[in-house]
From Swiss-Prot:
A cellular component annotation (GO) from this entry: cytosol
InterPro entries with a match to the protein in the record: Arg_succ_lyase_C, Argininosuccinate_lyase, Fumarase/histidase_N, Fumarate_lyase_CS, Fumarate_lyase_fam, Fumarate_lyase_N, L-Aspartase-like
Involved pathway(s): Amino-acid biosynthesis; L-arginine biosynthesis; L-arginine from L-ornithine and carbamoyl phosphate: step 3/3
Keywords of this entry: Amino-acid biosynthesis, Arginine biosynthesis, Cytoplasm, Lyase
EC number assigned by the record: 4.3.2.1
Subcellular location: Cytoplasm
Molecular-function GO term, any one: argininosuccinate lyase activity
Domain of life: Bacteria
Signal is among the record's keywords: no
Protein name per UniProt: Argininosuccinate lyase
Length: 461
């Protein structure tokens, strides 16, 4: 179905038909057709309110609602194929409604502009997809919690500057990402408070002379409140930008996590194994096992960042109130929504099918310079000022590297040559599991602390 050769919704004021190339250029139906459910949902609420306010008759409202419900099914089943000459999805639906029920279809738009119509559609879309992204994040949080529990007693290297820093519980590592993604989910929940405000009834930007009841429209659509200023209701896209920012934050965290997966699964690190079901090979090099899913997630973060910058740039400098520039908000919104949800979903599945190489990690962490901090803190407990302890430990590390003797195997006499305070107790500090277990501070990497973090996290899932 197409509205080819039909008058555009706004065309009656003009003496010449809209240039076809201009129409093709300005048409958005290929993008905003994704809003057809929300558009019909908003229209049904609007016409219900119109009938209750006696602006249209109940019989007219029933005919309009029945027609809209049929059109929704036609669009869902692909029986209506929007054409660029339809201009936008609102035009597609209204023209099809007119074909079905005649002139009464024209009453649907009473007291409504495409400005508040599309603002309503967008908020309904955001509300639905915020829920979808939160659900995907909840699944990822569940996987992270499972990993943290399973590997709570496994020791890995903690890194700073991509240099081995200190031994930590692997569970602590997974709980770090759990905490990040939990904040991402919480941010989306907070955004819902601002999204869940209905702009329907603001009309073009100045309101209407008809006795509309915006509160009733909002109630029918499940909104928690209504707009306070009709100009603001149709002319800002800050909630959309905030959502894109939240998506960018999610993708930033995923990208960092993906980088760890890529590095740790490499031959050089060899800490982590990705399931064959989530890896690819090379068309030339038979030995390759590539972390392509993680790489794609890392790459898609750039797209989502770009969408955020695109929206900020589109809105920069626009005079109040509505401007056609805002039509360009749909592609960034739809792309970031789909990318974020799909990335979180596939990353969760991939992560669930990874395993840490515990034997290799145990060997690597047992004789590594990452225990140097334990030496410094041992000296602090011997009442040596930390700066002096740091300097002494640095010299011990240099000697260890030059002599080729691992820290746990340095003779006591050699330790004493650096500081007389050393005694046999130093060797108890130079074990990775003892180092992790000895941590005493809140939120630390000790096994006990990680278990506390896990138990607290279970309450948030």
């Amino acid at each position: 179905m197409s509205s080819k050769n039909k008058e555009l919704l706004w065309q009656s004021r003009f003496s010449l038909p809209f240039d076809r190339d201009a129409l093709r250029f300005s048409s958005s139906v290929h993008v905003d057709k994704a809003l057809y459910r929300e558009d019909i949902q908003g229209s049904i609420a609007h016409v219900t309110m119109l009938a209750e306010q006696q602006i249209v008759s109940h019989e007219e409202a029933q005919a309009i609602i029945a027609g809209l419900q049929e059109i929704e099914l036609e669009l869902r089943d692909g029986n209506i194929v929007p054409h660029w000459e339809d201009e936008d999805i609102h035009t597609v639906i209204e023209n099809r409604l007119k074909e079905k029920i005649g002139a009464v279809a024209g009453k649907l738009h009473s007291g409504r502009s495409r400005n508040d119509q599309v603002a309503t559609d967008t908020r309904l879309y955001l509300r639905r997809n915020i829920g979808s992204l939160q659900a995907a994040l909840s699944e990822l949080l569940t996987v992270l919690l499972q990993k943290a529990e399973h590997y709570c007693d496994t020791i890995i290297f903690g890194y700073t500057h991509l240099q081995r820093a200190q031994p930590i519980s692997a569970g602590h590592y997974y709980m770090a990402y759990f905490t990040m993604f939990l904040r991402d989910r919480d941010r989306l929940q907070d955004l819902l408070k601002r999204v869940n405000i209905s702009p329907l009834g603001a009309a073009a930007f100045a309101g209407s002379t008809l006795p509309l009841n915006p509160a009733r429209s909002a109630e029918l659509l499940g909104f928690e409140g209504i707009f306070s200023n009709s100009i603001d209701a149709v002319s800002d896209r800050d909630i959309l930008i905030e959502f894109l920012s939240d998506c960018a934050m999610v993708m930033m965290h995923l990208s960092r996590f993906a980088e760890d997966v890529i590095l740790w699964s490499s031959y050089e690190f060899g800490y982590l194994e990705i399931s064959d079901a989530f890896a690819t090979g090379s068309s030339l090099m038979p030995q390759k096992k590539n972390a392509d899913i993680a790489e794609l997630v890392r790459g898609k973060a750039g797209r989502v960042y770009g969408n955020l910058m695109a929206m900020l740039t589109i809105m920069k400098g626009l005079p109040l109130s509505y401007n056609r520039d805002m039509q360009e908000d749909k592609q960034p919104l739809f792309d970031s929504t789909e990318t974020a949800i799909n990335s979180v979903t596939i990353f969760s599945k991939m992560l669930e099918n990874t395993r840490l190489k515990e034997e290799r990690l145990a060997k690597l962490t047992s004789e590594d310079l990452s225990l140097a901090t334990e030496i410094a803190e041992y000296l602090v407990q011997k009442h040596i000022p930390f700066r002096d302890a740091h300097r002494i430990t640095g010299k011990i590390v240099s000697w260890s590297i030059e002599s080729g003797v691992a820290l746990p195997h340095i003779p006591l006499e050699q330790f004493k040559s650096f500081a007389a305070e050393f005694d046999e107790g130093i060797y108890a500090c130079l074990k990775a599991d003892a180092s992790v277990r000895a941590k005493k501070t809140h939120g630390s990497c000790s096994f006990e602390s990680v278990k506390q973090q896990i138990n607290a996290a279970k309450e948030r899932i």
